[in-house]
A protein has these predicted regions:
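Conserved phosphate-donor/acceptor-positioning beta-strand/loop module used by diverse small-molecule
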Residues: 100-123, 131, 135
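Short edge beta-strands and adjacent turn/loop segments
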Residues: 211-235
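ATP-dependent small-molecule kinase phosphotransfer cores
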Residues: 35-86, 126
Length: 266
């Protein structure tokens, strides 16, 4: 069955409608409840793991190196959950890093503007103009975060299969429409798309292992082969390649490792 990934301009709105979709489809629901186990598994602070999903690196916040490691750990855990199929996923930014998987339905849910404004008003107070400014700032912040973290603008409608505005349709009807997409032929799992997700899973698991020593590493997988791109100097390439092959070779499912020297990293 297809996998449904929900992105929203409000975490609360996204969570609410995602739970309804999971109930309607009888799918498993995956959200930020997995962050605590992630923090425990990788010896991280849960607060930092949450920050990685919400904040760009800064002098007084997370460093870029730590943020990237945190996001890699989140990716690894999330993709592992998606392999289970029959999943509604929300709150983990999967719409930005699970790409090229045709049985994955990406949906952007825009909150009821009046409800969102009321929520911000109760939290921050102020005039209608102030609330409008806060809303624009929030959208800009999420755009900056997604571009910095994954090179994609999560506010861009073209990154989704469906965009629903809850100012125009109620949640129950939206739930029905989203759940109805699971029967579309184009979203049914095929061997190629299933293998794409398996490749993503293997690459994520290998990357997490390698990042402790090689923070800027990039990994892609094809079957049991992984290709590793890392910044290395020519004179140390052979030695570093040996270290990488030993580390990556210990990852379950990896049978062959290629190491490429890379000079261009985003």
């Amino acid at each position: 069955m297809p996998i449904i990934i929900i992105s929203s301009d409000s975490y609360e709105t996204g969570r609410e409608i995602s739970k309804k979709i999971a109930k309607a489809t009888e799918y498993n629901y995956v959200d930020r409840e997995i962050l605590a186990p992630i923090a425990e598994k990788f010896n991280l602070q849960k607060g930092q793991v949450i920050k990685a999903l919400e904040e760009t690196p800064s002098l007084f916040g997370l460093s870029a190196k730590l943020r990237n490691r945190l996001l890699a750990c989140i990716e690894e855990a999330t993709v592992g959950k998606l392999l289970g199929d029959n999943v509604v996923c929300h709150g983990l930014a999967a719409h930005l890093y699970v790409l090229g998987v045709s049985h994955l339905i990406k949906v952007r849910v825009l909150s009821d503007s009046k409800k969102l404004a009321s929520q911000l008003s109760s939290e921050a107070g102020g005039s209608a103009d102030k609330i409008e400014t806060l809303l624009k700032r929030k959208v800009k912040k999420r755009k900056q975060w997604s571009l910095d973290a994954f090179g994609l603008d999560e506010t861009d409608p073209s990154n989704y299969d469906m965009v629903i505005n809850l100012s125009q349709i109620d949640q129950d009807e939206a739930t029905k429409n989203i759940a109805g997409m699971t029967v579309y032929r184009k979203f049914q799992p095929i061997t190629y798309s299933i293998n794409c997700l398996k490749n993503k899973d293997l690459a994520c698991r290998a990357r997490v292992v390698l990042m402790e020593q090689f923070p800027d590493v990039k990994v892609r997988a094809d079957g049991s082969t992984i290709v590793v791109e890392v910044k290395i100097k020519k004179r140390t390439k052979q030695k570093i390649a040996g270290v990488i092959k030993k580390l990556a070779g210990g990852v379950n499912g990896v049978e062959y490792v290629e190491v490429h020297a890379a000079s261009d990293f985003r």
